[in-house]
Amino acid sequence: MNFSLHRQIIILLKSNLSLIRKIILYVVCFGLLYSAAEYYFGIWINDKREYIPLLIRVMAAAVFMGFSIAVFEGYLYMSFRKKPFLLIVILRSVSYSAIITFWLIVINGIWESIDNSISFVEGVVYYLQSEAYLVNLVTLIVLFIVILGVNQINSLHRKGELMKFILGRFHQPKEIEQLFCFIDLNHSTTIAEKLGNLRFGSFLKDYYSDITDAIRYSGAEIYMYVGDEIILSWPVTGKTNYNKVLSCFFMMKETIRMKEDVYMQRYGYVPEFKAGLHGGKVLVTWVGELKKEIIYLGDVLNTASRIQGECKRMGCDFLVSEYIKDKILDPEYTIDFADELVPRGKESKIKVYRVVDATSN
């Protein structure tokens, strides 16, 4: 699998599909609640025969507005993700207002023209002069600001962590099965000494930003940043795609390879990294009072870290445990036995395997 620009675009599109579905779902739910309120309380309509037409308009607006805003968010992410937060807020506010106004006018203009047997332009004028237009516009703008505000707050936490806290998950320690991948930047001390603290900080920021799409595509949770090391995590379920988990590492490699000229021009160094992947039973729970956080405890993390630490000695970039190797059935990857090692505090050895992309050039 040779991850080209084509593959990077596919990754971005698939990431945005998730956003599109989420926004459309939120707006559809709001639309249903609004329609139900109209039906039972008659806020704007008194004739219940108008309920179905209203529901049709609400659903159409939800789909078109949701899709348009999600596409805009994808563009915003690509072009402005490193810009100041205030600039992004202003762009969102102006763009959302324009998108919402456009679809309100188009959908209701068409409906009024059909319902009153008038032209589309007359239907638009009729709708703009109604009290419903201003109420709909303000309500929808506030709704989208709330949705994206919650999404922005959620981005400050790990994937799904805010919802887990709200639902009360893991407030009591619980044993679950989880995958962990430790990814460590090579020669970070040397690079930091050569670049200095500020430029090395920018180097790390660009590196973490550039590998984000691969992480998102693989469905990983960023468990922790530890200086120049990043720890990724995946829940183990019946639907776990282990090939997609492995692909995260190779997508990250290819993303950096495609931008190596930019890194060389800007910093004189290109990020290189090694990774160790392992999985198994861990204990998960919320901890802390001043700062609440979900933590994972168990030998699985220590073993994954040890596997990553052996990459240099074994002369390879990506090592996985036998636990992972036994679950990979696709010939997309070549997995060869590398060595046995004894995790810290353990007596029994575990087998580790090097992973190579079988279809790369």
Regions found by a protein language model. Give the residues of each.
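Catalytic NTP-binding/metal-coordinating core of nucleotidyl cyclase/transferase enzymes
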Residues: 173-247
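Hydrophobic transmembrane alpha-helices
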Residues: 68-77, 85-131
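Membrane-anchoring hydrophobic segments
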Residues: 1-58
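Regulatory cytosolic signal-relay segments
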Residues: 5, 115-176
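Juxtamembrane segments at transmembrane-helix boundaries
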Residues: 16, 36-49, 59-87, 102, ...
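Cytosolic regulatory/linker segments at or just downstream of nucleotide-handling modules
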Residues: 313-361
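Catalytic core of nucleotidyl cyclases, primarily class III adenylyl/guanylyl cyclases
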Residues: 218-244, 260-299
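Membrane-interface segments at the starts/ends of alpha-helical transmembrane spans
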Residues: 46-60, 89, 122-135
